[in-house]
């Protein structure tokens, strides 16, 4: 591109000049150069300025640079003296930092520095080291001090960018694997077959919803952690020396981490379900069950009555089984009456409540374990309880007419099942056993509940197929990621152990039946 008429240029094509390296990170010296071409460019403010294509003598053509007029000087005696002065300052600076070889890697730098006579170098070295930055290059752009600060900023910015790119690359290359047990892999295959081939749907709302599953797992986890707590001092004396804190709890036995994990699963599930966890055949059902027309708000008077009845019940909630109980039999006269909230409610209003609030059933189970009940009642209870809740019921005996839900000290014969809770405060134990994933007033009565209140284990299991991809886009330290994956592994083992309870084949129904189950409005609880 040729220079336009009307603009004056101080230099012309083919002229020999002295030029600064345009890159501020390079050595601040003047190089012998030659102008190859002249064009009209624009500065940062959009104004037209002349630009010169500079070829540095002795440099490869790849180092040719476009330079503004302020970086170019005429080849005069005065500018030659400035060139030698800057070269001497560069020598002194490089000697002071001890990085001469690394600083003078570019072609042309050595030739400029060697052009200074040896005697002149020796004579002025001491003055060069002690001279100020304004003396060294006050003629151009503020001096060496300003140049050095600018260079430090550029390097820091470049280093930060490199670290960011490296971190992003490591995240892209990091492979996260979640091992799903074989029985659950088969469940995923069956789930796909039922939905896509047989055109069946999971009946919603599920009798055992995700909130129930996650809450039950935390209590299951806490009980197992408590049982192993008293074994750790006997079998792991070396751990006391490794961890000076006597209250150290491994990540895989930390109840607080377990609570955080299940809460994270709940939040992730509610967000990702409509995005990646539903088959196309299920989209219509999802829109129907999440519609505000599908749910009815509960009256405050009913909620207040139920709460007052819960406060009168002496038995604390130990577990949340989601199995319906018979309402024909009544508790004995000597026992306090437990709330019977479902007796007067139509079946349509009970389905969602079974899956979200079920401490009443636990109270009845606790009383039946210590008080004589009719034979038919005991058989019905045992037959209707899932194996998970029967298993935990054996581990959590409760004495009727007693405010303490569990024995806090082991028996003399050593058969107390809660020896692991030895030395712990009763309120800590009750807090774990009565812990709830979400508060009682959630969700608000005027809003439909989130998917975790409606869907069950079938859709929760699908989340673990997508979790590696989701976690790969999050920033985790290796330590935190390892602990999280360990808790995922324990939770999947829990689902596999009670597979028959959480994944019944009867959960899949024909589309017409699934549509009928969502035809009438349901109550939010």
UniProtKB/Swiss-Prot annotation:
Biased composition (Basic and acidic residues): 136-146
Biased composition, class Low complexity, residue ranges: 320-332
Purpose of the protein: Non-catalytic component of the MSL histone acetyltransferase complex, a multiprotein complex that mediates the majority of histone H4 acetylation at 'Lys-16' (H4K16ac), an epigenetic mark that prevents chromatin compaction. The MSL complex is required for chromosome stability and genome integrity by maintaining homeostatic levels of H4K16ac. The MSL complex is also involved in gene dosage by promoting up-regulation of genes expressed by the X chromosome. X up-regulation is required to compensate for autosomal biallelic expression.
Tissue specificity statement from the Swiss-Prot or TrEMBL entry: In testis, expression is mostly restricted to the spermatocyte stage and only in a small portion of spermatogonia.
Residue list for modification Phosphothreonine: 409
One GO biological process term: positive regulation of DNA-templated transcription
GO cellular component, one term: MSL complex
Assembly and binders: Component of the MSL histone acetyltransferase complex at least composed of the KAT8/MOF, MSL1/hampin, MSL2 and MSL3. Interacts (via the MRG domain) with MSL1 and KAT8/MOF.
Major site of localization recorded for this protein: nucleus
Native source organism of the sequence: Mus musculus
Disruption phenotype: Mice with a conditional deletion in male germline do not show any phenotype: spermatogenesis is not affected.
Key words of the record: Chromatin regulator, DNA-binding, Nucleus, Phosphoprotein, Transcription, Transcription regulation
Pfam family, one: MRG
Highest taxon listed in the record's lineage: Eukaryota
Name of the protein this chain belongs to: MSL complex subunit 3
Location in or out of the cell: Nucleus
Required for the histone acetyltransferase activity of the MSL complex, as annotated region: 294-444
Domain Tudor-knot: from-to ranges: 13-72
Region (Disordered): 119-148, 302-383
Span of domain MRG: 172-521
Chain positions with Phosphoserine modification: 313, 315, 371, 404, 411, 415
GO molecular function, one term: DNA binding
């Amino acid at each position: 591109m040729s220079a336009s008429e009307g603009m004056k240029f101080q230099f012309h094509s083919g002229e020999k000049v002295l030029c600064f390296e345009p890159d501020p990170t390079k050595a601040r010296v003047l190089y012998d150069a030659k102008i190859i071409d002249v064009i009209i460019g624009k500065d940062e403010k959009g104004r037209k300025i002349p630009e010169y294509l500079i070829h540095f003598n002795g440099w490869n053509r790849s180092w040719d640079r476009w330079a503004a007029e302020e970086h170019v000087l005429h080849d005069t005696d005065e500018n030659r003296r400035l060139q030698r002065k800057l070269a001497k300052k560069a020598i002194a600076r490089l000697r002071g930092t001890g990085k001469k070889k690394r600083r003078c890697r570019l072609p042309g730098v050595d030739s400029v520095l060697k052009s200074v006579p040896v005697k002149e170098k020796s004579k002025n070295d001491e003055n060069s080291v002690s001279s100020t930055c304004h003396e060294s290059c006050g003629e151009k752009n503020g001096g060496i001090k300003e140049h050095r600060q600018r260079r430090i900023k550029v390097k820091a910015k470049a280093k930060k960018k490199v670290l960011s790119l490296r971190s992003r690359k490591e995240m892209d290359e990091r492979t996260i694997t979640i091992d799903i047990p074989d029985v659950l892999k088969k469940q995923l295959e069956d789930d796909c077959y039922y939905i896509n081939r047989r055109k069946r749907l999971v009946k919603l709302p599920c009798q055992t919803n995700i909130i129930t599953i996650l809450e039950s797992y935390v209590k299951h986890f806490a009980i197992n952690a408590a049982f192993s707590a008293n074994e750790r001092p006997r079998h792991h004396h070396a751990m006391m020396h490794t961890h000076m804190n006597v209250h150290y709890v491994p990540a895989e036995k930390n109840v607080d981490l377990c609570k955080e994990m299940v809460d994270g699963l709940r939040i992730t599930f509610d967000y990702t379900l409509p995005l990646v966890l539903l088959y196309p055949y299920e989209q219509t059902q999802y829109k129907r069950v999440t519609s505000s027309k599908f749910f009815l708000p509960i009256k405050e008077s009913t909620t207040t009555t139920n709460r007052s009845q819960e406060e009168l019940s002496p038995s604390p909630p130990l577990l949340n089984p989601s199995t319906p109980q018979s309402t024909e039999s009544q508790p004995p006269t000597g026992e306090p009456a437990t709330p019977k909230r479902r007796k007067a409610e139509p079946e349509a209003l009970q389905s969602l409540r079974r899956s979200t609030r079920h401490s009443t059933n636990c109270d009845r189970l606790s009383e039946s374990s210590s008080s004589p009940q009719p034979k038919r009642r005991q058989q019905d209870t045992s037959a209707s309880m899932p194996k998970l809740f029967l298993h935990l019921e054996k581990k959590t005996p409760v004495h009727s007419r007693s405010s303490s839900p569990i024995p806090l000290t082991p028996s003399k014969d050593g058969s107390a099942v809660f020896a692991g809770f030895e030395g712990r405060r009763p309120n800590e134990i009750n807090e774990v056993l009565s812990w709830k994933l979400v508060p009682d007033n959630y969700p608000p009565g005027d809003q439909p509940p989130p998917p975790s209140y409606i869907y069950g284990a079938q859709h929760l299991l699908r989340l673990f197929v997508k979790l590696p991809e989701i976690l790969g886009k999050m920033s985790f330290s290796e330590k935190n990621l390892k602990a999280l994956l360990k808790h995922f592994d324990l939770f999947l083992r829990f689902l596999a152990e009670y597979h028959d309870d959480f994944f019944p084949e009867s959960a899949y129904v024909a589309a017409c039946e699934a549509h009928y189950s969502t035809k009438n409005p349901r109550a939010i609880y």
